[in-house]
Amino acid sequence: MGEMKSMQMGVIGALFLSVASSVSIVICNKALMTNLGFPFATTLTSWHLMVTYCTLHVAYKLNFFENKPIDMRTVVLFGLLNGISIGLLNLSLGFNSIGFYQMTKLAIIPFTVLLETLFLNKKFSQKIKFSLFLLLVGVGIASITDLQLNFVGSVLSLLAIATTCVGQILTNTIQKRLNVTSTQLLYQSAPFQAAILFVSGPFVDKYLTSLNVFSFHYSPIVVGFITLSCLIAVSVNFSTFLVIGKTSPVTYQVLGHLKTCLVLAFGYTLLHDPFTPRNIAGILIAVLGMLLYSYFCSVASKSKQASSDSTFLGKDRDTTPLLGQENENHHEAKKLDKHSPV
């Protein structure tokens, strides 16, 4: 029971860390890109991953965690896939309207549910599907303003959805099947994610912004915000792997939409961004969907635990009489042996 409570506290801690760090990095990057004019998102992400790897390497050398070797091919392919998915999401934003980009992010949940159902035989109850539907409708109402389609943008969005879904499912599957921690997986895959983004980032950013990251004027305040962004990113990357490993890819996506609602609310209240009753209604519907999802998942988890416990007790009841009978027969045999002339 104590172990179960400790596990629940670990999950809550991971969720809180993910929300706090993600909202913080959005605020930091908004200031960096909007106010200070630094538009190189893909290159910045490669720096995030480099700093994450360096931080974890120092932690490893100081014996904060134990490294567990993972098959190199698995790590390389996993790292490259995650790096490509980040690049595709950025390209999708560049080729599509903001509204269609938001639709792309919303589509990740149903695609993840579909893939886990088809390939991992995972079951999602109708109640959980309904709560996810409410969540997606709410976030859609709150954040989607325009939907402009084009062929290249649509193809990039589909590729971004596919790579993101597969990458997040693998993040969960690798941790469970290879029995590695989120820290061990991130430590070994981060260099490959960083490498592909470091090489492709300047080209992607130049194509999207028509600016060169190497000729940008790096004032002290810009360098300060980049450093802060990289430090927060360590927590973001760590908590991402932690949440997906402890919960599921779908739960991580639900958490992502909670962050979206918090960022929107932050913009409305503190930055005085324009908002309408539609935005507020969308956020409320999304929050209701999240609460229902959390409740239904909790009920399903308790039901599964109770079923597991009852099965275990049932097995005990089945085996006890047999053991008793075996001992009794053994005792009778001993008595016969004593009186036997042989």
From Swiss-Prot:
Observed effect of gene inactivation: No visible phenotype. Slight reduction of xylose content in the cell wall composition.
> Principal localization?
Golgi
Record keywords:
Antiport, Endoplasmic reticulum, Golgi apparatus, Membrane, Sugar transport, Transmembrane, Transmembrane helix, Transport
Q: Name one GO cellular component term.
A: Golgi membrane
Organs and tissues of expression: Ubiquitous.
Q: Where are the transmembrane segments?
A: 7-27, 36-56, 75-95, 100-120, 132-152, 154-174, 184-204, 221-241, 250-270, 280-300
Positions of the UniProt region annotated as Disordered = 305-342
Protein name, per record? UDP-xylose transporter 1
